[in-house]
């Protein structure tokens, strides 16, 4: 069984390398037209150049998974801001794409919790489509839209989970097919359990990104041993390994909050269940210390008898 690892957005080991530098709409409004464009394009260029630095770092450390920052282009989906963030930066998008393709990196996006399809308010669905389209356009500009995924949560329950799930199935029809084809769903830590999310994924033929920490915070009746094969099966039509999110609680009191690093004892039960099924899969680490947490976890896991480190961020068990 091969397990590959990756992390989210910022490489903590790199100095001044945020790929998510921002520009607020408030500061944008205060500037003249030319100043707005100059400032905004400067921030975007920084984010893209920092992303390139991070990709070089990942390649050097043989880290095959990476989640791009959704904030890579500030104000991209703001209704009062219109600008060309694709054509102007074509050389940089292509440079990012060339690195990803040459080194066979697995890239993803994870829009925020407001991008959802369960609401009864039409503007929420419209905004979700706008946000999903923004993420897809970036993947397309990079040249990896047909092999990369945009991951979201199911959404809210709004007092009636059954009705909300029905709305999800209706609202998702409004998302263009080519974008839906590149989306995944994740179980959350309060509302939609692993079993509920799996059912939705199966009905819509959407790959399921299983989050173990969320599962432990929002348990369902069905045991994970029974659910995991079906979860992994949702990826079968993609020819890509299933992906799992890993983090651990900050404390018993703050169980849902993410700790700085991964507590190996917390994730061991999941790893043993996965080993029983012996299916290759990828792990996205969602700890606060990101790449540093990744290295620490791999060091700890590779010290276990029977687990062999075969590259910077890949284990064989």
UniProtKB/Swiss-Prot annotation:
Keywords: DNA damage, DNA excision, DNA repair, Endonuclease, Hydrolase, Nuclease. It is an enzyme of class 3 (hydrolase). Its EC number is 3.-.-.-. GO terms for molecular function: endonuclease activity. The keyword Repeat does not apply. SUPFAM superfamilies: Xylose isomerase-like. GO terms for biological process: nucleotide-excision repair; pyrimidine dimer repair; response to UV. InterPro entries: UvdE (IPR004601), UvdE_bac (IPR023520), Xyl_isomerase-like_sf (IPR036237). Component in a DNA repair pathway. Removal of UV LIGHT damaged nucleotides. Recognizes pyrimidine dimers and cleave a phosphodiester bond immediately 5' to the lesion. Belongs to the uve1/UvsE family. PANTHER family: UV-DAMAGE ENDONUCLEASE (PTHR31290:SF5). This is UV DNA damage endonuclease. The gene is uvsE.
